[in-house]
């Protein structure tokens, strides 16, 4: 564990309801910057910022439309960079909430994945091989895209599940975790992490970290392997970055 994390006292912020600086009735990143002294006086030395990426907000920001863009209601990417810098000047670390299990149906990846023509994103999400196929026990949506298939959901209709593969494949449209499609999804998540770490954030709290691989073992063998892979990348490239995974315990391989 990182030394700073051992001594961290977190203040959790849902930006929308925290502090509004422009009078639109919605909290924003500038509001967090203005209240850093207040947070410091409370004895907190770390922030956990709930979902703040671009989203249609059908599920409070847990339906991400663009992982590399701050939601306009909260500000801009420049505001995020300013927040990281202002927090660091006061010895406060900042974690962003990352939702890697699914995206919004409005995400550019999903729009490409929904096309009938094979492309880079065809396997970014979990699709059956026919618009009449059920989801092998999982919730699914069919008949809403040009692609001949139904797509698997994680929660609501607006949240198509990203494809990290299956621990046990029971249908021909299911892919093992080491197939090119699932591996590309993992690399895409690493790319998102690098983007924000390079901007100055100190790591991520990961929502529903156990939900990545479908038909996983009881102890989440395959999902844990993905997180060990991502953690190894962080340890190598960003040794001070924190990775806090919700609802999962990574056991030894």
For each feature predicted by the language model, list its residue ranges.
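Acidic/aromatic-lined carbohydrate-recognition and catalytic surfaces
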Residues: 2-187, 198, 209-247
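Structured alpha-helical segments in the cores of large, soluble enzyme domains
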Residues: 189-201
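Conserved small/polar residues in nucleotide/adenosyl-binding loops
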Residues: 248-253
């Amino acid at each position: 564990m990182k030394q700073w994390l051992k001594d961290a006292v977190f203040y959790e912020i849902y930006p929308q309801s925290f502090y509004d600086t422009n009078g639109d009735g919605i909290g924003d990143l500038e509001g967090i910057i203005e209240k850093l002294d207040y947070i410091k006086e409370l004895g907190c030395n770390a922030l956990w910022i709930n979902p703040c990426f671009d989203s249609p907000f059908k599920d409070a920001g847990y339906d991400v439309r663009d992982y590399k863009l701050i939601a306009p209601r909260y500000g801009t990417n420049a505001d995020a960079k300013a927040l990281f810098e202002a927090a660091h000047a006061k010895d406060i670390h900042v974690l962003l909430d990352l939702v890697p299990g699914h995206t919004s149906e409005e995400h550019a990846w999903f729009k490409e994945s929904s096309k009938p023509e094979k492309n880079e994103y065809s396997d970014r999400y979990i699709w059956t091989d026919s618009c009449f196929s059920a989801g092998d026990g999982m919730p699914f949506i069919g008949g809403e895209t040009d692609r001949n298939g139904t797509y698997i959901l994680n929660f609501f209709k607006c949240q198509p599940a990203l494809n990290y593969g299956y621990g046990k494949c029971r249908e021909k449209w299911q892919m093992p975790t080491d197939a090119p499609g699932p591996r590309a999804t993992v690399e895409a998540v690493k790319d998102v992490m690098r983007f924000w770490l390079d901007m100055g954030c100190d790591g991520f709290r990961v929502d529903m970290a156990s939900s990545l691989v479908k038909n996983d073992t009881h102890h989440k063998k395959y999902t844990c392997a993905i997180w060990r892979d991502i953690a190894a990348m962080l340890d190598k490239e960003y040794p001070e970055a924190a990775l806090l995974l919700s609802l999962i315990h990574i056991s030894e391989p």
